[in-house]
């Protein structure tokens, strides 16, 4: 039996998040159902991250034990894509060591968040970007992210139900103005708390609107209090873009 990993992408619009749950449609659930059809037995998968309801992925990484040693990685990829719904796609399959675990062996996770600042709504993008028809001061936002980069206690930017260690490391945050009034916020780190990226985006938007000075980010971070921060940016603007390991 060999162990394989797969890079997958999915449109999170019609999923109740990644993690398997009874009686609702999840990314993990549809992948494990597809693998069961292929291998005629239940195959359990592990993932590099558990995206929330409505969050998308370009480069989620999963791993599982393949019970058929005769199948090549290309055979596995083709079989999975033939059995998956059209909002999930396997981009690549490759062999990994038998003890590989995507959650623990990944060294960097990269998230992308898209904000559409045009005055007019784009109905075709409504599930894939946060439509926010206001001018944002990107220079001020870039100053604010410097307080977040590095290793800190991110209690102010976590969801209340997350009981894990709040100390996390953000390697880098980039804020880019793209074509057609799109703003990209790219966040790179080893691991993240639940809704941490979306909570950071909401705080950066406060700075971009000039409701907060960039230095306010340091104050919020040091407060270690969720109520000191802003709200939470919508899920549909967030993409689990890529992992490195």
From Swiss-Prot:
InterPro entries the UniProt entry points to: PsdUridine_synth_cat_dom_sf, PsdUridine_synth_TruA, PsdUridine_synth_TruA_a/b_dom, PsdUridine_synth_TruA_C, TruA/RsuA/RluB/E/F_N
Any one GO MF annotation of this record: tRNA pseudouridine(38-40) synthase activity
Alphabetized Gene3D superfamilies for the sequence: Pseudouridine synthase I, catalytic domain, C-terminal subdomain (3.30.70.660), Pseudouridine synthase I, catalytic domain, N-terminal subdomain (3.30.70.580)
Catalytic activity: uridine(38/39/40) in tRNA = pseudouridine(38/39/40) in tRNA
A biological-process GO annotation: tRNA pseudouridine synthesis
Binding site residues for substrate: 111
Keywords: Isomerase, tRNA processing
This protein's record includes keyword Oxidoreductase: no
SUPFAM superfamilies named among the record's database cross-references: Pseudouridine synthase (SSF55120)
Enzyme nomenclature, EC number: 5.4.99.12
Active site: 52
Listed NCBIfam families: hisT_truA
Protein family per UniProt: Belongs to the tRNA pseudouridine synthase TruA family.
Job description of the protein: Formation of pseudouridine at positions 38, 39 and 40 in the anticodon stem and loop of transfer RNAs.
Subunit structure of this chain's protein: Homodimer.
This protein's name: tRNA pseudouridine synthase A
Native source organism of the sequence: Thermotoga petrophila (strain ATCC BAA-488 / DSM 13995 / JCM 10881 / RKU-1)
């Amino acid at each position: 039996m060999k162990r394989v990993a797969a890079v997958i992408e999915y449109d999170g619009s019609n999923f109740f998040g990644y993690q398997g749950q009874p009686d609702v449609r999840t990314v993990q659930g549809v992948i494990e159902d597809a693998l069961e059809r292929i291998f005629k037995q239940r195959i359990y998968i592990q993932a590099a991250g558990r995206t929330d309801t409505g969050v998308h992925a370009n480069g989620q990484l999963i791993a599982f034990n393949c019970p058929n040693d005769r199948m090549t990685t290309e055979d596995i990829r083709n079989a999975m894509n033939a059995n998956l719904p059209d909002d999930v796609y396997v981009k690549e399959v490759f062999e990994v060591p038998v003890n590989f675990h995507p959650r623990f062996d990944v060294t960097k996770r990269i998230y992308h968040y898209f904000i559409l600042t045009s005055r007019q709504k784009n109905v075709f993008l409504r599930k894939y970007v946060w439509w926010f028809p206001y001018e944002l001061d990107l220079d001020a936002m870039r100053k604010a992210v410097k307080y977040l980069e590095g290793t800190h206690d991110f209690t102010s930017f976590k969801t209340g139900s997350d009981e894990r260690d709040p100390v996390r490391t953000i390697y880098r945050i980039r804020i880019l103005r793209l074509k057609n009034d799109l703003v990209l916020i790219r966040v790179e780190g080893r691991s993240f708390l639940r809704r941490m990226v979306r909570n950071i985006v909401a705080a950066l938007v406060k700075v971009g609107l000039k409701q907060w000075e960039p230095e306010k980010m340091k104050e919020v971070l040091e407060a270690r209090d969720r109520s000191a921060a802003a709200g939470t940016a919508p899920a549909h603007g967030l993409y689990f873009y890529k992992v490195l390991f």
